[in-house]
Every structure is written in C-alpha cells, then in structure tokens.
Amino acid sequence: MSIAIITMMEYLSDKEMAASENFYQTIQKEWFGNAQIVINVRTGPTSLLSLAVYSSYEDAETNLPKRKEFQDIVKDKFTVVDSFYYEGDITYFEASKAAEITTEWKT
C-alpha cells in the first residue's frame, strides 16, 4: 500500500519560502526521485505543505538521510521557524483529471 508523508513548514518570510521552493526544485529528482507524487501547496504567505507519496514505508525510509539533510539546510539557509510531518497509509486516491492540474513550476 502506498503511503503519504505530509510536511508542514513555516518560514520567516515569503522570500525565504520562495528561495526554499526554488532550492527544492533543483534537488527533488536526485534526492527524492523515488516519490510517486510530490505536491507542494502554499497554505499562506510564509507556510508550505508538501505531500509526497511513496510505494511503501520502506521505500520512503530510503530517503531519511537526504530528508534530514534537506531539513537542516532549510532551517539554516532559508530560516524555517517550524517544521513537522505526518505519515500514513493512503486509503483513497482518485486522479482522473490529473492532466488538467497546472503548477507554477514545470518538470
């Protein structure tokens, strides 16, 4: 069963958040390329929710060293003032209109 990791991050400023998002775009495929889906949502001027889906807990655990490194970088370089995450089994998924989703960044 696929699992989701939902990370919440609160930044000191909107500029810090944007810089962190730009940094994440440059490393996502190399550091977290085994994620099945990644969706980042700006939930406020200085807050971000990141949803990453993995095929299993074991698959997600392979990213733990890079996840820690990423968290350390964003806390030091991009002034994250708070960060926490949840994880759990995905119990429902529907994506029939996934092709219609538009984003600020293109992969």
Regions found by a protein language model. Name each.
Residues M1-L49, S55-E69, D76-T107:
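Short S/T/G/P-rich N-terminal loop/turn motif that feeds into the first structured element of a domain
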